[in-house]
């Protein structure tokens, strides 16, 4: 699982700190890919930079291909800095569920419901918290 997470992260721009994420600039790369394709429909492989949702989708697809039991989860935020946030749950043979980090500490597995899992999933975040803290909003595809 960790190796797959690292492959996904490297394909879509690498590891970022929480502070760097607001200024990652993936929306510019999405626009570039749309212009090149002359379409709003893109392949994940068109992107050199991907946000959490792009990484979560690619991880889910690849995990399914290699038989890793996985679920893609989308955020409850419908506006604000965390709109479109997504992450993956992975399941072990021992009925344990983990959130896999594809953005920050790439490959880390956080037990479901743990402080780290909730932070990664932004479950306790106010929808506009990134804007309030001064970082740019996470916009894009």
Spans of model-derived segments:
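Secondary-structure boundary elements
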Residues: 1-45
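Long, acidic and serine/threonine-rich low-complexity regions
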Residues: 127-141
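Hydrophobic/aromatic-rich core segments of domains that either
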Residues: 50-130
